[in-house]
Amino acid sequence: MASLPGIDEHTTSEELITGDNEWHKLVIPKGSDWQIDLKAEGKLIVKVNSGIVEIFGTELAVDDEYTFQNWKFPIYAVEETELLWKCPDLTTNTITVKPNHTMKYIYNLHFMLEKIRMSNFEGPRVVIVGGSQTGKTSLSRTLCSYALKFNAYQPLYINLDPQQPIFTVPGCISATPISDILDAQLPTWGQSLTSGATLLHNKQPMVKNFGLERINENKDLYLECISQLGQVVGQRLHLDPQVRRSGCIVDTPSISQLDENLAELHHIIEKLNVNIMLVLCSETDPLWEKVKKTFGPELGNNNIFFIPKLDGVSAVDDVYKRSLQRTSIREYFYGSLDTALSPYAIGVDYEDLTIWKPSNVFDNEVGRVELFPVTITPSNLQHAIIAITFAERRADQATVIKSPILGFALITEVNEKRRKLRVLLPVPGRLPSKAMILTSYRYLE
């Protein structure tokens, strides 16, 4: 009898599964990645039976269940590993396991940085440069995780890409001492200080609000935020010998977002005292020669290294980025799968708010370090994320620009008739009488 297309006498019943919620066994060979691509509503549960596997350097414990949602990531097998998994959206036929040929570069980098830490009280200050989807953030996360494994270090992770919501909401740049293991289940690396109980140690980021989506909307403001963050980082390194010896890992935006002359990188190197540059590209890529020629005199050619694009890096589109940004905002107010938080909604009069917004060259505004007052209307503020600064409510714009960030709030409703707003706060209490900055991000519950 003729068989149906795609099905023959050798096809097992397991291969005919079209997605269920049963446990399935998978063996990942040593040195290989299981490349996972989860939908926003999909949920994957993984349990390791034997062997050692990592997610960006964070090892998964044997016999513990890990839950993942809305994430594209690889599980790397340090040694041959048997694990169980279940997910209604995955089938045994759609699983992708491939050899990873770039981990040797990451190992070499880790031991090079470790040698610097062991021989000097001033740790390495590394900036990672490359194009989109080359693995800059993956490399940053892995190097931070390996530093924690090797010794009692607290590497300072510095995120300079406002579109990456790591330990904070999108639209910010931040510096975070990685003081303990990262949460392997979260694309946002883990949670910052929270009012709820958490399974893992919270991280405390130092945050500067840029407020816009793309750095080319206001390069001057972006560079000013880096300068201010650099001052905070310098103070932290001066006061904390452990962080100073651990060093910094600086994650940058895609090279395509920077000026042709790479002026932003010069600024980053100066303000953060960078002494090592890692370039994710091939040796034949024009970027490699350009970087060596541009930064060789500044850093020394012996301190500039190339690394091939990392294996296991998933292609991401704008829809996926938006989904991660939305997830990070939701987690800020409501918590993650393991940590439920209860935000606090309050009513606020129009007269009790002073809100500014950064200038934006795409809105026919001058792209410089300047803030403009915001008129309170539904079109301006409905569903908007606002940054609450430490500056007093009636402070001038220069003071507001330089002020640290107290936290973030979500404006869920603007009632013009009653001249009131409904504001969601992460903690109970009154809205602080502080100046606020409108960001470009919105969240519709």
UniProtKB/Swiss-Prot annotation:
InterPro entries: Clp1 (IPR028606), Clp1/Grc3 (IPR045116), Clp1_C (IPR010655), Clp1_C_sf (IPR038238), Clp1_N (IPR032324), Clp1_N_sf (IPR038239), CLP1_P (IPR032319), P-loop_NTPase (IPR027417). It comes from Saccharomyces cerevisiae (strain ATCC 204508 / S288c) (Baker's yeast). Belongs to the Clp1 family. Clp1 subfamily. PANTHER family: CLEAVAGE/POLYADENYLATION FACTOR IA SUBUNIT CLP1P (PTHR12755), POLYRIBONUCLEOTIDE 5'-HYDROXYL-KINASE CLP1 (PTHR12755:SF6). This is mRNA cleavage and polyadenylation factor CLP1. Changing residue 161 to A: Compromises interaction with PCF11. No effect on growth. ATP binds at residues 33, 72, 133-138. Component of the cleavage factor IA (CF IA) complex, which is involved in the endonucleolytic cleavage during polyadenylation-dependent pre-mRNA 3'-end formation. Associates with HRB1/CF IB to form the cleavage factor I (CF I) complex. CF I is required for correct positioning of a larger protein complex, the cleavage and polyadenylation factor (CPF) complex, which contains the catalytic subunits executing mRNA cleavage and polyadenylation. CLP1 mediates interactions between CF IA and CPF factors. The gene is CLP1. GO terms for molecular function: ATP binding; polynucleotide 5'-hydroxyl-kinase activity; RNA binding. Component of the cleavage factor IA (CF IA) complex, which is a heterohexameric complex with 2:2:1:1 stoichiometry of RNA14, RNA15, PCF11 and CLP1. It contains 2 copies of an RNA14-RNA15 dimer and 1 copy of CLP1-PCF11. The complex interacts with the cleavage factor HRB1/CF IB to form the cleavage factor I (CF I) complex, and binds to RNA. Interacts directly with PCF11. Interacts with the CPF components CFT1, PTA1, PFS2, YSH1 and SSU72.
